[in-house]
């Protein structure tokens, strides 16, 4: 493990949540690739009761949503208020994210 991996792994959830808040897809992609050796959960809830996916949907960041799903974010998880990523996207008027999440849900459930 490199020195960068060690510093990232020392507080992986905090580092991850901060990267999501920045919304920088390239930075987050690099971070996610480097955190594969860490005890790390892409579906963890932050202090506001949101997962990284929920936060990315709130921000309307489709690129980040796709990246998080690629790395295992569960689109079915509900936040503290009981809203899924799809609910948040629909309420926020993020039609591109709504369509993406519906498509992912359709294929992940095996529906045709």
From Swiss-Prot:
Keyword Transcription: yes
Single GO biological process annotation from the record: protein targeting to chloroplast
GO MF entries: chloroplast targeting sequence binding
Top-rank taxon: Eukaryota
Coiled coil: none
Keywords of the record: ANK repeat, Developmental protein, Notch signaling pathway, Repeat, Transcription, Transcription regulation
The keyword Phosphoprotein appears for this protein: no
Gene3D superfamilies named in the record: Ankyrin repeat-containing domain (1.25.40.20)
ANK repeat boundaries on the chain: 48-77, 81-110
Pfam families: Ank_2
Family the entry assigns: Belongs to the NRARP family.
Function: Regulates independently canonical Wnt and Notch signaling by modulating LEF1 and Notch protein turnover. Stabilizes LEF1, a pivotal transcription factor in the Wnt signaling cascade, by blocking its ubiquitination. Involved in angiogenesis; involved in intersegmental vessel patterning during development.
Protein name per the record: Notch-regulated ankyrin repeat-containing protein A
Organism, as annotated: Danio rerio (Zebrafish)
């Amino acid at each position: 493990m490199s020195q960068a991996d060690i510093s990232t792994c020392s507080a992986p959830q905090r580092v991850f949540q901060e990267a999501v808040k920045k919304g920088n897809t390239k930075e987050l992609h690099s971070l996610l690739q480097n955190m594969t050796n860490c005890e790390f959960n892409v579906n963890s809830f932050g202090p506001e009761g949101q997962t990284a996916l929920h936060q990315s949907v709130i921000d309307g960041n489709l690129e980040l949503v796709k990246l998080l799903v690629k790395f295992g974010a569960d689109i079915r998880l509900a936040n503290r208020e009981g809203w899924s990523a799809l609910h948040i996207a629909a309420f926020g008027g993020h039609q591109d994210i709504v369509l993406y999440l519906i498509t992912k849900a359709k294929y992940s459930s095996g529906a045709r």
